[in-house]
Amino acid sequence: MHVFYFMKITLDLLRAHVGKVINESRSPAGNWLQLTLAAVEKGKASISVLVRKEMCNPFGHIHGGMMSLVIDEAIGWAIISLEAESHYTSLNLNVDFLYAAPEGETITAVANIVRQGKKIVHAEVHVYDSKQTLLAKAASNLIVTGMKIINS
């Protein structure tokens, strides 16, 4: 088991994992993505993901649901960077798909917490390919659940 399972994650701990593949987090779906934490600061996170065959639609491009998963994971890491005391859950996720990414492409999702209220957080994400083409943009509102984050 990895430390991400057992403790409240601090910004310093996140920074120590920049450039590394995250495959032992609390998120089984995120672990499956084999994402790399590309950058992190308070309220912002970037993740990179290699588009694998099992992520693709019949045309050989990333499936919209997979793109949404990448976006949701990026938001999750940006939320974690806030060092909140409680978990958040999504109220909505609105995605504009602009261009497709083929199998073998590495995509980068850049998440930014635009507003953090007492109960609601608003996040925005842009997803780029290796040529910096904007592939998708998204916005999400999340609500604090009241479930406390384990702190050991």
What are the residue ranges of the model-derived segments?
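Terminal targeting signals and extreme-terminal segments of soluble enzymes
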Residues: 2-152
